[in-house]
Amino acid sequence: MKTKLILLYGGKSAEHEVSLQTAFSVINALDLEKFEAAPIYITNEGEWIQGPLLSGKLDFVEQLRFSATDTIKLATTESEKSEGEAISPAVLEADGQETVVFPLLHGPNGEDGTVQGLFEVLNIPYVGNGVLASSAAMDKIVMKKIFADAGIPQVPAVAVRLIDWKNYQAEMVAEMEEVLTYPVFVKPANLGSSVGISKATNKKELADAMTEAFLYDRRVVVEQGVVAREIEMGVLGNDTPVCSVPGEILPEGAVATFYDYKAKYQDNNTALIIPTEVDPEILEQMKEYAVQAFLGLDASGLVRADFFLTEDNQLFLNEVNTMPGFTPYSMYPLLWQETGLPYGALIERLVDLAKERHAAKNALKYKLED
């Protein structure tokens, strides 16, 4: 019997369009001889809409943007159900068929542990990281604390709350300028794909960048800018993760002063070098830090570790991404392709890891013996 693979994408997130691109790519790579593919589109308004079972490849991303008029509206994230009515969408029920959910969601309400919690409550296997790893890695402030506890080197940074910025802006700027030197990068704590991130080279730009970042989150992290190579590495597995070859991001002709949202997803001017050349000793250190980060987060399935490597060979772990993009030009699947694991095989491996993790969880004891 085929495995029913529920493909969940879209979502109430600034990264809604990225999620659609990821879903389009994954769906077209599925082996429909092995999987029964059931797409569910989450609209910008939070509605869950079930599309038809897929019988072939898609031609356009827009084919995934279902509407309630021509498909089945399953549920909504807003409170519209009457008291006592079941809240789990019927499509998530296995009905005796082996079922796995593949959440192709990015950003808040997607890779931050919230939707993962739903699958945990429903006891359905799902691809990728659990609640803890997803939420911790999504929050740049919490993530940095975990890395620091593991002894992983990071660039200097300062965390700022919106309430403190409103009440003590001058003092906060003074603290930042004491710890950091320009340029700095200002980032919302809970967002990915460089959304809301700005580079600041002076006090005026810093204030503008803080205003921009606080549009997306009430907590912001300000990081020291460094002149460095941007090198990424894929991590794959559960309890015994393995690393891919390293890849490097090279924006052509100074397309962007940093690898921003537009460069990542909206143009083809970003060059990826896979594998990239790294000193063997540094490469081993990179693998060690990537695995330490994976295990420190209690990650599962997949993680992409993003590093900075300076000219004098200082290595910093910038961040990890627990749901890296799967677009045709995304780094994570390309890293594994060059390591020897093709795209379709990578997807199947992730599904197998989801089943493995779910089985291990269900083997645990959840009640005391009489």
From Swiss-Prot:
Free-text function comment from the UniProt entry: Cell wall formation.
CC per GO annotation: cytosol
Gene Ontology process terms (BP): cell wall organization; peptidoglycan biosynthetic process; regulation of cell shape
Pathway: Cell wall biogenesis; peptidoglycan biosynthesis
Cofactor: Mg(2+); Mn(2+)
Species in which this protein is naturally found: Listeria monocytogenes serotype 4b (strain F2365)
Domain of life (superkingdom): Bacteria
One of the Pfam families matching this protein, by short name: Dala_Dala_lig_N
Localization per record: Cytoplasm
Catalysed reaction equations from the record: 2 D-alanine + ATP = D-alanyl-D-alanine + ADP + phosphate + H(+)
Keywords per UniProt: ATP-binding, Cell shape, Cell wall biogenesis/degradation, Cytoplasm, Ligase, Magnesium, Manganese, Metal-binding, Nucleotide-binding, Peptidoglycan synthesis
GO molecular-function terms, A-Z: ATP binding; D-alanine-D-alanine ligase activity; metal ion binding
Residue stretches making up the ATP-grasp domain: 144-352
Binding annotation for Mg(2+) 1: D306, E319
Enzyme class name: ligase
Residues reported in the UniProt entry to bind ATP: 177-232
Record InterPro entries: ATP-grasp, ATP_grasp_subdomain_1, D-Ala_lig_Van_CS, D_ala_D_ala, Dala_Dala_lig_C, Dala_Dala_lig_N, PreATP-grasp_dom_sf
Cofactor binding, per record: Binds 2 magnesium or manganese ions per subunit.
Main location: cytoplasm
PROSITE patterns, per database record: ATP_GRASP, DALA_DALA_LIGASE_1, DALA_DALA_LIGASE_2
Residues reported to bind Mg(2+) 2: E319, N321
Protein name listed in UniProt: D-alanine--D-alanine ligase
NCBIfam families: D_ala_D_alaTIGR, PRK01966.1-2, PRK01966.1-4
Assigned EC number: 6.3.2.4
Lineage: Bacteria, Bacillati, Bacillota, Bacilli, Bacillales
Family: Belongs to the D-alanine--D-alanine ligase family.
